Curated annotation (Swiss-Prot):
This is ATP-dependent RNA helicase RhlB. Transmembrane segments: none annotated. Its main location: cytoplasm. Residues 245-390 form the Helicase C-terminal domain. Residues 401-413 have a biased composition (Polar residues). A motif (DEAD box) lies at residues 165-168. Residues 395-435 are annotated as: Disordered. Component of the RNA degradosome, which is a multiprotein complex involved in RNA processing and mRNA degradation. It holds the Pfam family DEAD. It is an enzyme of class 3 (hydrolase). One of its GO terms (cellular component) is cytosol.
Length: 435
Protein backbone atom coordinates (compact mmCIF):
# COMPACT_ATOMS: atom_id res chain seq x y z
CA UNK A 1 0.00 0.00 0.00
CA UNK A 2 1.35 3.41 -0.95
CA UNK A 3 1.93 5.68 2.02
CA UNK A 4 0.47 9.17 1.91
CA UNK A 5 2.42 12.08 3.34
CA UNK A 6 1.17 15.59 3.92
CA UNK A 7 4.43 17.61 4.16
CA UNK A 8 7.76 17.49 2.37
CA UNK A 9 9.70 17.38 5.64
CA UNK A 10 11.69 14.16 5.94
CA UNK A 11 12.56 12.62 9.30
CA UNK A 12 16.08 11.98 8.00
CA UNK A 13 16.63 15.73 7.54
CA UNK A 14 15.74 16.69 11.12
CA UNK A 15 19.06 15.75 12.70
CA UNK A 16 17.65 12.79 14.62
CA UNK A 17 19.85 10.11 16.13
CA UNK A 18 20.63 7.56 13.38
CA UNK A 19 19.08 4.74 15.43
CA UNK A 20 15.80 6.65 15.61
CA UNK A 21 15.84 7.28 11.87
CA UNK A 22 16.54 3.60 11.27
CA UNK A 23 13.54 2.59 13.38
CA UNK A 24 11.29 5.03 11.53
CA UNK A 25 12.47 3.84 8.12
CA UNK A 26 11.92 0.19 9.04
CA UNK A 27 8.29 1.05 9.78
CA UNK A 28 7.98 2.95 6.49
CA UNK A 29 7.93 6.47 7.93
CA UNK A 30 9.83 8.88 5.69
CA UNK A 31 7.83 12.13 5.62
CA UNK A 32 6.35 14.05 8.54
CA UNK A 33 2.72 14.96 9.06
CA UNK A 34 2.09 18.65 9.91
CA UNK A 35 2.16 18.16 13.69
CA UNK A 36 5.40 16.19 13.40
CA UNK A 37 6.99 18.76 11.10
CA UNK A 38 6.13 21.56 13.53
CA UNK A 39 6.73 19.81 16.86
CA UNK A 40 9.94 17.85 16.26
CA UNK A 41 12.27 20.79 15.48
CA UNK A 42 11.06 22.50 18.67
CA UNK A 43 11.55 19.37 20.77
CA UNK A 44 14.94 18.58 19.24
CA UNK A 45 16.10 22.03 20.34
CA UNK A 46 15.23 21.06 23.93
CA UNK A 47 12.13 23.24 24.16
CA UNK A 48 8.98 21.95 25.89
CA UNK A 49 5.84 21.76 23.81
CA UNK A 50 2.06 21.86 24.17
CA UNK A 51 0.77 20.46 20.90
CA UNK A 52 -2.72 20.48 19.44
CA UNK A 53 -3.67 18.53 16.36
CA UNK A 54 -6.70 16.77 15.00
CA UNK A 55 -7.10 13.13 15.99
CA UNK A 56 -5.18 10.78 13.71
CA UNK A 57 -2.56 13.25 12.51
CA UNK A 58 0.50 11.59 14.02
CA UNK A 59 0.82 12.98 17.55
CA UNK A 60 1.94 9.62 18.93
CA UNK A 61 4.81 9.23 16.49
CA UNK A 62 5.87 12.82 17.20
CA UNK A 63 6.29 12.35 20.93
CA UNK A 64 7.74 8.83 20.64
CA UNK A 65 10.36 10.07 18.19
CA UNK A 66 11.27 13.01 20.41
CA UNK A 67 11.39 10.87 23.56
CA UNK A 68 13.64 8.18 22.09
CA UNK A 69 15.92 10.76 20.50
CA UNK A 70 16.25 12.58 23.82
CA UNK A 71 17.17 9.40 25.70
CA UNK A 72 19.75 8.41 23.08
CA UNK A 73 21.40 11.83 23.00
CA UNK A 74 21.24 12.71 26.71
CA UNK A 75 23.29 10.84 29.34
CA UNK A 76 21.33 9.10 32.07
CA UNK A 77 21.62 10.51 35.58
CA UNK A 78 24.71 9.37 37.42
CA UNK A 79 23.96 6.44 39.73
CA UNK A 80 20.63 5.60 38.08
CA UNK A 81 19.58 1.96 38.51
CA UNK A 82 18.17 0.01 35.50
CA UNK A 83 14.78 -0.29 37.22
CA UNK A 84 14.35 3.49 37.43
CA UNK A 85 12.58 4.93 34.36
CA UNK A 86 14.11 7.80 32.42
CA UNK A 87 10.90 8.72 30.61
CA UNK A 88 7.24 8.43 31.44
CA UNK A 89 4.29 8.52 29.03
CA UNK A 90 0.87 8.97 30.65
CA UNK A 91 -2.35 8.07 28.84
CA UNK A 92 -5.99 8.38 29.95
CA UNK A 93 -7.02 4.82 29.08
CA UNK A 94 -5.40 1.41 29.11
CA UNK A 95 -6.31 0.92 25.45
CA UNK A 96 -4.37 4.04 24.50
CA UNK A 97 -1.43 3.01 26.70
CA UNK A 98 -1.31 -0.37 24.96
CA UNK A 99 -1.48 1.28 21.53
CA UNK A 100 1.39 3.62 22.41
CA UNK A 101 3.46 0.69 23.65
CA UNK A 102 2.76 -1.28 20.48
CA UNK A 103 3.78 1.72 18.38
CA UNK A 104 6.94 2.18 20.44
CA UNK A 105 8.27 -1.38 20.38
CA UNK A 106 9.34 -1.59 16.71
CA UNK A 107 10.89 1.88 16.85
CA UNK A 108 13.25 0.94 19.70
CA UNK A 109 13.92 -2.66 18.69
CA UNK A 110 17.57 -1.97 17.82
CA UNK A 111 18.27 0.90 20.24
CA UNK A 112 18.64 -0.89 23.56
CA UNK A 113 15.86 1.24 25.04
CA UNK A 114 13.46 -0.79 27.18
CA UNK A 115 9.76 0.07 27.39
CA UNK A 116 7.28 -1.29 29.92
CA UNK A 117 3.53 -1.03 30.45
CA UNK A 118 1.62 -0.23 33.64
CA UNK A 119 -2.18 -0.16 33.55
CA UNK A 120 -5.11 -1.48 35.54
CA UNK A 121 -7.17 -4.51 34.61
CA UNK A 122 -4.08 -6.61 33.91
CA UNK A 123 -1.94 -8.87 36.10
CA UNK A 124 -0.01 -6.79 38.63
CA UNK A 125 2.67 -9.47 38.99
CA UNK A 126 3.26 -9.74 35.25
CA UNK A 127 3.81 -6.01 34.94
CA UNK A 128 5.97 -6.00 38.07
CA UNK A 129 8.24 -8.68 36.61
CA UNK A 130 8.67 -6.62 33.46
CA UNK A 131 9.56 -3.51 35.46
CA UNK A 132 12.05 -5.40 37.62
CA UNK A 133 13.80 -6.51 34.44
CA UNK A 134 14.68 -2.91 33.67
CA UNK A 135 12.79 0.00 32.16
CA UNK A 136 13.78 3.18 30.37
CA UNK A 137 10.36 4.30 29.15
CA UNK A 138 7.33 3.69 31.35
CA UNK A 139 4.01 3.84 29.48
CA UNK A 140 0.73 3.60 31.33
CA UNK A 141 -2.27 4.98 33.12
CA UNK A 142 -1.79 7.18 36.15
CA UNK A 143 -3.54 4.93 38.67
CA UNK A 144 -1.36 1.87 38.11
CA UNK A 145 1.79 3.99 37.82
CA UNK A 146 1.02 5.49 41.22
CA UNK A 147 0.37 2.00 42.63
CA UNK A 148 3.84 0.85 41.58
CA UNK A 149 5.39 4.09 42.81
CA UNK A 150 3.82 3.74 46.26
CA UNK A 151 5.03 0.14 46.40
CA UNK A 152 8.52 1.54 45.76
CA UNK A 153 8.97 -0.52 42.61
CA UNK A 154 10.60 2.58 41.13
CA UNK A 155 11.04 6.25 41.87
CA UNK A 156 10.72 9.22 39.55
CA UNK A 157 14.00 10.92 40.45
CA UNK A 158 15.63 10.04 37.13
CA UNK A 159 12.89 11.20 34.78
CA UNK A 160 14.33 13.12 31.83
CA UNK A 161 11.32 13.18 29.50
CA UNK A 162 7.58 13.34 30.19
CA UNK A 163 4.65 12.92 27.83
CA UNK A 164 1.06 13.67 28.73
CA UNK A 165 -1.16 12.38 25.92
CA UNK A 166 -4.83 13.31 25.45
CA UNK A 167 -4.59 15.88 28.23
CA UNK A 168 -8.15 17.10 27.74
CA UNK A 169 -9.40 13.56 28.21
CA UNK A 170 -7.42 13.34 31.45
CA UNK A 171 -9.55 16.18 32.78
CA UNK A 172 -12.74 14.57 31.54
CA UNK A 173 -11.93 11.35 33.40
CA UNK A 174 -10.87 13.07 36.61
CA UNK A 175 -7.19 12.10 36.53
CA UNK A 176 -5.67 15.53 37.09
CA UNK A 177 -4.94 14.95 40.78
CA UNK A 178 -3.02 11.80 39.84
CA UNK A 179 -1.06 13.69 37.19
CA UNK A 180 -0.10 16.43 39.62
CA UNK A 181 0.91 13.79 42.19
CA UNK A 182 3.35 12.30 39.67
CA UNK A 183 4.67 15.62 38.36
CA UNK A 184 5.53 16.78 41.87
CA UNK A 185 7.74 13.73 42.42
CA UNK A 186 9.84 14.25 39.31
CA UNK A 187 12.82 16.55 38.79
CA UNK A 188 11.98 20.22 38.22
CA UNK A 189 10.35 21.04 34.84
CA UNK A 190 13.50 22.74 33.52
CA UNK A 191 15.47 19.52 34.15
CA UNK A 192 13.37 17.38 31.82
CA UNK A 193 11.83 17.53 28.34
CA UNK A 194 8.07 17.96 28.69
CA UNK A 195 5.50 17.18 26.02
CA UNK A 196 1.76 17.68 26.26
CA UNK A 197 -0.51 16.67 23.40
CA UNK A 198 -4.23 17.19 23.21
CA UNK A 199 -7.06 17.38 20.71
CA UNK A 200 -7.93 20.74 22.25
CA UNK A 201 -5.81 23.21 24.20
CA UNK A 202 -8.50 24.48 26.54
CA UNK A 203 -7.80 26.95 29.33
CA UNK A 204 -7.49 24.20 31.92
CA UNK A 205 -5.02 22.27 29.74
CA UNK A 206 -2.93 25.40 29.21
CA UNK A 207 -3.00 26.05 32.96
CA UNK A 208 -1.66 22.53 33.58
CA UNK A 209 1.12 23.18 31.06
CA UNK A 210 2.00 26.45 32.79
CA UNK A 211 2.21 24.74 36.19
CA UNK A 212 4.29 21.70 35.28
CA UNK A 213 6.23 22.58 32.12
CA UNK A 214 9.08 24.98 31.37
CA UNK A 215 7.96 27.75 29.03
CA UNK A 216 6.25 25.37 26.59
CA UNK A 217 5.83 26.46 23.02
CA UNK A 218 2.29 26.04 21.74
CA UNK A 219 2.08 24.25 18.41
CA UNK A 220 -1.32 24.11 16.77
CA UNK A 221 -2.26 22.38 13.55
CA UNK A 222 -5.66 23.83 12.79
CA UNK A 223 -7.83 21.66 10.52
CA UNK A 224 -9.77 23.26 7.69
CA UNK A 225 -12.80 22.10 9.60
CA UNK A 226 -13.00 20.32 12.91
CA UNK A 227 -14.20 17.09 11.34
CA UNK A 228 -11.51 16.85 8.69
CA UNK A 229 -11.98 17.56 5.00
CA UNK A 230 -11.25 13.94 4.05
CA UNK A 231 -14.32 12.68 5.89
CA UNK A 232 -17.58 12.54 3.96
CA UNK A 233 -20.37 13.26 6.43
CA UNK A 234 -23.97 12.17 5.98
CA UNK A 235 -27.05 12.52 8.18
CA UNK A 236 -30.34 10.62 8.28
CA UNK A 237 -33.50 11.37 10.26
CA UNK A 238 -34.87 7.89 11.04
CA UNK A 239 -37.74 7.06 13.31
CA UNK A 240 -36.82 4.92 16.29
CA UNK A 241 -38.60 2.01 14.61
CA UNK A 242 -36.51 2.38 11.44
CA UNK A 243 -33.08 2.84 13.02
CA UNK A 244 -31.94 -0.77 13.12
CA UNK A 245 -33.30 -1.60 9.68
CA UNK A 246 -31.68 1.54 8.26
CA UNK A 247 -28.33 0.65 9.83
CA UNK A 248 -28.42 -2.87 8.43
CA UNK A 249 -29.48 -1.64 5.00
CA UNK A 250 -26.71 0.96 4.87
CA UNK A 251 -24.15 -1.62 5.94
CA UNK A 252 -25.31 -3.84 3.08
CA UNK A 253 -25.13 -0.90 0.65
CA UNK A 254 -21.83 0.54 1.81
CA UNK A 255 -20.22 -2.84 2.52
CA UNK A 256 -17.52 -1.22 4.70
CA UNK A 257 -14.16 -2.93 4.95
CA UNK A 258 -13.82 -1.81 8.56
CA UNK A 259 -16.46 0.19 10.43
CA UNK A 260 -17.10 1.41 13.96
CA UNK A 261 -20.69 1.83 15.15
CA UNK A 262 -21.12 4.16 18.12
CA UNK A 263 -24.03 4.26 20.54
CA UNK A 264 -24.48 6.25 23.73
CA UNK A 265 -25.10 3.44 26.20
CA UNK A 266 -23.77 -0.01 26.96
CA UNK A 267 -27.28 -1.44 26.68
CA UNK A 268 -27.78 0.01 23.19
CA UNK A 269 -24.38 -1.27 22.05
CA UNK A 270 -25.27 -4.76 23.22
CA UNK A 271 -28.58 -4.55 21.35
CA UNK A 272 -26.88 -3.45 18.12
CA UNK A 273 -24.29 -6.22 18.45
CA UNK A 274 -27.03 -8.81 18.99
CA UNK A 275 -28.89 -7.76 15.83
CA UNK A 276 -25.76 -7.65 13.66
CA UNK A 277 -24.49 -10.98 14.98
CA UNK A 278 -27.85 -12.58 14.20
CA UNK A 279 -27.58 -11.30 10.64
CA UNK A 280 -24.25 -13.05 10.13
CA UNK A 281 -21.91 -10.08 10.42
CA UNK A 282 -18.42 -10.48 11.83
CA UNK A 283 -18.96 -8.03 14.67
CA UNK A 284 -17.22 -7.21 17.94
CA UNK A 285 -18.46 -5.41 21.04
CA UNK A 286 -16.37 -2.90 22.99
CA UNK A 287 -17.85 -1.38 26.15
CA UNK A 288 -16.59 -0.61 29.62
CA UNK A 289 -17.90 -3.94 30.95
CA UNK A 290 -15.88 -6.09 28.56
CA UNK A 291 -12.91 -7.68 30.43
CA UNK A 292 -9.50 -6.31 29.49
CA UNK A 293 -8.20 -9.52 27.89
CA UNK A 294 -11.31 -9.78 25.75
CA UNK A 295 -11.07 -6.10 24.78
CA UNK A 296 -7.51 -6.62 23.59
CA UNK A 297 -8.56 -9.68 21.60
CA UNK A 298 -11.47 -7.83 19.97
CA UNK A 299 -9.25 -4.90 19.00
CA UNK A 300 -6.66 -7.30 17.59
CA UNK A 301 -9.32 -9.09 15.52
CA UNK A 302 -10.70 -5.78 14.27
CA UNK A 303 -7.26 -4.48 13.35
CA UNK A 304 -6.30 -7.71 11.58
CA UNK A 305 -9.57 -7.93 9.66
CA UNK A 306 -11.20 -11.01 11.16
CA UNK A 307 -13.87 -8.67 12.56
CA UNK A 308 -15.41 -6.14 10.16
CA UNK A 309 -17.69 -4.18 12.47
CA UNK A 310 -16.98 -2.89 15.97
CA UNK A 311 -19.88 -1.69 18.13
CA UNK A 312 -18.61 0.64 20.82
CA UNK A 313 -19.36 3.26 23.40
CA UNK A 314 -17.13 6.31 23.55
CA UNK A 315 -14.50 4.23 25.34
CA UNK A 316 -13.18 3.55 21.81
CA UNK A 317 -13.59 7.07 20.48
CA UNK A 318 -10.45 8.56 21.92
CA UNK A 319 -6.86 7.52 21.48
CA UNK A 320 -7.17 4.14 19.82
CA UNK A 321 -4.99 3.86 16.73
CA UNK A 322 -6.97 1.53 14.51
CA UNK A 323 -5.76 1.83 10.91
CA UNK A 324 -7.90 1.93 7.79
CA UNK A 325 -11.32 2.44 9.36
CA UNK A 326 -13.43 3.21 6.31
CA UNK A 327 -16.76 4.04 7.97
CA UNK A 328 -18.10 5.40 11.24
CA UNK A 329 -21.79 5.08 12.10
CA UNK A 330 -23.23 7.29 14.82
CA UNK A 331 -26.24 5.17 15.69
CA UNK A 332 -26.90 7.73 18.43
CA UNK A 333 -25.78 11.34 18.13
CA UNK A 334 -23.49 11.95 21.11
CA UNK A 335 -24.48 14.25 23.94
CA UNK A 336 -21.04 15.90 23.89
CA UNK A 337 -20.16 17.90 20.77
CA UNK A 338 -16.48 17.02 21.02
CA UNK A 339 -17.33 13.33 21.08
CA UNK A 340 -18.82 13.70 17.59
CA UNK A 341 -15.47 14.95 16.30
CA UNK A 342 -13.51 12.26 18.12
CA UNK A 343 -15.85 9.52 16.95
CA UNK A 344 -15.70 10.32 13.26
CA UNK A 345 -11.99 11.00 13.60
CA UNK A 346 -11.56 7.22 13.70
CA UNK A 347 -11.83 7.35 9.90
CA UNK A 348 -10.10 9.56 7.33
CA UNK A 349 -6.75 9.22 9.11
CA UNK A 350 -3.23 9.83 7.83
CA UNK A 351 -4.31 11.14 4.45
CA UNK A 352 -6.97 8.50 3.78
CA UNK A 353 -10.61 9.27 3.06
CA UNK A 354 -13.50 8.15 5.23
CA UNK A 355 -17.27 8.15 5.52
CA UNK A 356 -19.32 9.13 8.56
CA UNK A 357 -23.04 8.32 8.74
CA UNK A 358 -25.11 9.70 11.62
CA UNK A 359 -28.68 9.12 12.76
CA UNK A 360 -30.63 12.05 14.19
CA UNK A 361 -33.39 9.98 15.75
CA UNK A 362 -36.29 10.96 17.98
CA UNK A 363 -34.19 10.59 21.13
CA UNK A 364 -30.98 12.33 20.09
CA UNK A 365 -31.85 14.79 17.30
CA UNK A 366 -31.88 17.42 20.04
CA UNK A 367 -28.06 17.18 20.10
CA UNK A 368 -27.67 18.12 16.43
CA UNK A 369 -27.79 21.96 16.62
CA UNK A 370 -25.00 22.08 19.20
CA UNK A 371 -22.89 19.62 17.18
CA UNK A 372 -23.27 21.62 13.97
CA UNK A 373 -22.48 24.85 15.80
CA UNK A 374 -19.34 23.26 17.23
CA UNK A 375 -18.10 21.84 13.90
CA UNK A 376 -19.09 25.10 12.16
CA UNK A 377 -20.99 23.53 9.31
CA UNK A 378 -24.21 21.68 8.68
CA UNK A 379 -24.07 17.96 8.03
CA UNK A 380 -25.49 17.01 4.60
CA UNK A 381 -28.85 15.28 4.93
CA UNK A 382 -29.89 12.20 2.96
CA UNK A 383 -33.43 10.90 2.73
CA UNK A 384 -34.34 7.25 2.78
CA UNK A 385 -37.26 5.20 1.55
CA UNK A 386 -38.63 3.22 4.49
CA UNK A 387 -40.22 0.72 2.11
CA UNK A 388 -36.75 -0.13 0.73
CA UNK A 389 -35.29 -1.02 4.09
CA UNK A 390 -34.46 -4.61 4.95
CA UNK A 391 -37.65 -6.16 6.24
CA UNK A 392 -36.63 -9.72 7.14
CA UNK A 393 -34.27 -9.02 10.01
CA UNK A 394 -33.62 -12.10 12.15
CA UNK A 395 -34.27 -11.98 15.87
CA UNK A 396 -31.28 -10.69 17.84
CA UNK A 397 -28.97 -13.16 19.51
CA UNK A 398 -27.05 -13.00 22.76
CA UNK A 399 -24.22 -15.34 21.88
CA UNK A 400 -21.79 -15.33 18.93
CA UNK A 401 -22.96 -18.80 17.82
CA UNK A 402 -25.53 -17.43 15.38
CA UNK A 403 -22.96 -15.47 13.36
CA UNK A 404 -22.76 -18.23 10.76
CA UNK A 405 -26.31 -17.71 9.54
CA UNK A 406 -26.48 -17.24 5.79
CA UNK A 407 -26.49 -13.65 4.51
CA UNK A 408 -29.24 -12.36 2.24
CA UNK A 409 -28.30 -11.64 -1.35
CA UNK A 410 -30.30 -8.52 -2.23
CA UNK A 411 -31.51 -5.59 -0.17
CA UNK A 412 -32.66 -3.03 -2.69
CA UNK A 413 -31.59 0.53 -1.92
CA UNK A 414 -32.58 2.59 1.09
CA UNK A 415 -31.45 6.03 -0.05
CA UNK A 416 -33.86 8.08 -2.10
CA UNK A 417 -32.95 9.80 -5.35
CA UNK A 418 -29.91 8.92 -7.40
CA UNK A 419 -27.94 7.31 -4.60
CA UNK A 420 -26.41 3.91 -5.30
CA UNK A 421 -28.29 0.78 -4.36
CA UNK A 422 -26.83 -2.52 -3.29
CA UNK A 423 -26.02 -4.59 -6.37
CA UNK A 424 -22.97 -6.28 -4.92
CA UNK A 425 -22.76 -9.94 -4.25
CA UNK A 426 -22.63 -10.88 -0.58
CA UNK A 427 -19.21 -11.11 0.99
CA UNK A 428 -17.86 -14.62 0.80
CA UNK A 429 -17.34 -16.40 4.13
CA UNK A 430 -13.82 -16.10 5.46
CA UNK A 431 -11.72 -19.10 4.50
CA UNK A 432 -10.20 -20.83 7.51
CA UNK A 433 -6.92 -22.64 7.18
CA UNK A 434 -7.01 -26.32 7.93
CA UNK A 435 -5.05 -27.42 10.97
Amino acid sequence: MKKTHITEQKFADLGLNPQVVEGLEKKGFEFCTPIQALALPVLLSGQDIAGQAQTGTGKTLAFLTATFNHLLTTPAHEGRQPTQPRAIIMAPTRELAIQIYNDAEPLIASTGIKAALAYGGESYDKQLTKLQGGVDVLIGTTGRIIDFYKQRVFNLNNIQAVVLDEADRMFDLGFIKDIRFLFRRMPAPQERLNMLFSATLSYRVQELAFEHMHNPEHVVVEPEQKTGHRIQEELFYPSNEDKMALLQTLIEEEWPDRAIIFANTKYKCESIWAHLAADGHRVGLLTGDVPQKKREKILEQFTQGSVDLLVATDVAARGLHIPQVTHVFNYDLPDDCEDYVHRIGRTGRAGASGHSISFACEDYAINLPAIEEYIEHTIPVSDYDSSALIQDLPAPVRTPSARNQQRRTNTGGARSGDRKSNNRRPRQPRQHKEA
